[in-house]
Amino acid sequence: QPDRGLAVVWTMREEQLLPAGVMPPSVRGARFCKAERRKECLCGAMVIPGREPFGYAITGDTVVFQDSGGTVRPCLKQIAKEQSWREPGLGIFLYDVWELLTSDDLKQLSELERRITKLENTVLSGVSGAFHQNLMAVRRKVMVYVRYYAQMADMIYKFLENGNGYFSQEDLRLFQLFRERIGRLGEEAQNLREHCLQVWELFQAELDLRQNRIMKVLTIVTTVFMPLTLLVGWYGMNFHNMPELSWEHGYLAMILVSGLTVFLTIWLLKKKKLW
């Protein structure tokens, strides 16, 4: 009640709201933040990550919350306890509610960033474990915040349009400040999304590098022992006109030839820096 210098909050039952015709839309099954301009009010819903959704309806001097999950109630109690407005009004009230609802968002985003950095260090240390599942879980949470801030920005834009004429220029200035705050949080969420993508690409690069190392080892082993396979296949034919088969030192000679072949092959690979 700006004319009397008062800001009053009532807790009312649903049936008490019906006669006034100021009833928020049902939030049952609500999946995103929205604002709708109707003839008699500005109404919509807010779906905040990790909290129960709630609905709201605004007329010229009244704000009604449908808050069965208890999301807004702590904010109203804190405002009643701590805030002392020089000029109580609709805009400053909504601004303070939104500020309190998003006060922990930066902390939540910082925690997600910490988890992403931890996964990145896990990749660099070569310990993958359940990396894929953990990264996908973090990415899903990041995407929830990305969509949430985009929806909030659209919702605040509806308030800035002021189609019902409920808000003063000072109210619109506060709404614009909050929209800029939401924009910064949205940019932070987008940065986390890109960080997730970079960590995934790093994981794929490390995976490809490991596979290349394995293929390199297999190629070297095949190259080293291919001549020995040729010797084994050659002398395994046991032709009678092979003098080495009946030679007294034939077995020892084959061992020496095989060892010399392996040594020369390894030396050649190292000289060519292939190993």
PLM feature segments, named:
Residues Q1-E161, F167-S168, L177, R181-R184, ...:
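Peripheral, non-transmembrane regulatory/ligand-interaction domains of membrane transport proteins
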